């Protein structure tokens, strides 16, 4: 099965681009199509004929609805048919099982969780713009590092449960956040904000030999490496001022 991996289109920022998606290609979009749920929804409907996609950390940046409502709207629209939104969901096609989740991070990339959480709180726009519904108090608040740490733990538990379930199948994991420090560009390897971009999940790839591909986004730099039997691919478009990619070459094609 041939697929094309892409991420970080940011179509709300890259709004002068005429996108060129092949209707016969199966696309795997690893998050951050847009910061607005309706823009994301309409873009996928108009451009993607078949494939899967996950949410990125930018979903909710528009501030119009909560993250929960955005995720609900996308899943409601893309839970059936040839294009699927995966938010802790599985999609099986041919002999391949796609497991998708945003992921988030555990802030433990450097062994100093509290410090990295504080840095993320200070510098990441996620914690300024994205809103969540606080069930305990019945109020709408901004997400915080503790919120996303909770998401991460839930999402990793889901991944492992599904990997146990499908351990005799060929699996592709689709996330937005990265599963290893190896995905981080050299100039950011010692930057502690990177703990909000990647986690050390190589142990998952070491444990499950049937993961043929783990594709992700978020870091805005390409990544190509292997952990055990798993190929890790990141193929971001990024922002208009950091990418000279020919739009005709959009996506990284791989045969799985």
What are these regions (language model features)?
Residues 1-4, 90-100, 169-170, 226-231:
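Beta-strand-turn-beta hairpins that frame and shape the catalytic cleft
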Residues 24, 185, 192-212, 219-256:
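Binuclear metal-dependent phosphoesterase catalytic core
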Residues 77-83, 158-170, 203-214:
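A structural motif corresponding to the C-terminal end of an alpha-helix
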Residues 99-172, 179-188:
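Active-site-proximal loop/helix segment associated with metal-binding centers of metalloenzymes
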């Amino acid at each position: 099965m041939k697929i094309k991996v892409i991420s970080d289109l940011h179509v709300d920022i890259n709004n002068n681009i005429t996108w060129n998606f092949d209707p016969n290609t199966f696309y795997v979009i690893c998050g951050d199509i847009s910061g607005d749920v309706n823009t994301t929804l309409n873009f996928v409907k108009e451009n993607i004929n078949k494939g899967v996609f996950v949410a990125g950390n930018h979903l909710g940046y528009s501030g119009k609805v909560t993250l929960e409502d955005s995720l609900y709207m996308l899943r409601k629209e893309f839970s059936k048919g040839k294009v699927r939104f995966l938010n802790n969901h599985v999609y099986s096609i041919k002999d391949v099982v796609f497991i998708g989740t945003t992921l988030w991070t555990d802030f433990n990339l450097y062994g100093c969780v509290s410090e990295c959480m504080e840095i993320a709180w200070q510098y990441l726009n996620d914690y300024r713009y994205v809103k969540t519904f606080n069930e305990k108090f019945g109020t709408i608040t901004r997400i915080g590092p503790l919120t996303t740490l909770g998401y991460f733990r839930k999402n990793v538990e889901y991944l492992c449960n599904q990997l146990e379930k499908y351990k005799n199948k060929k699996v592709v994991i689709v996330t937005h956040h990265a599963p290893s420090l190896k995905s981080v560009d050299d100039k950011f390897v010692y930057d502690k904000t990177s703990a909000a971009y990647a986690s050390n999940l190589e142990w998952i790839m070491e444990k499950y030999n049937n993961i043929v591909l783990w594709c992700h986004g978020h870091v805005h730099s390409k990544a190509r490496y292997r952990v055990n039997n798993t190929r890790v691919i990141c193929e971001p478009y990024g922002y208009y001022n950091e990418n000279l990619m020919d739009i005709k070459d959009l996506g990284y094609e791989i045969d799985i």
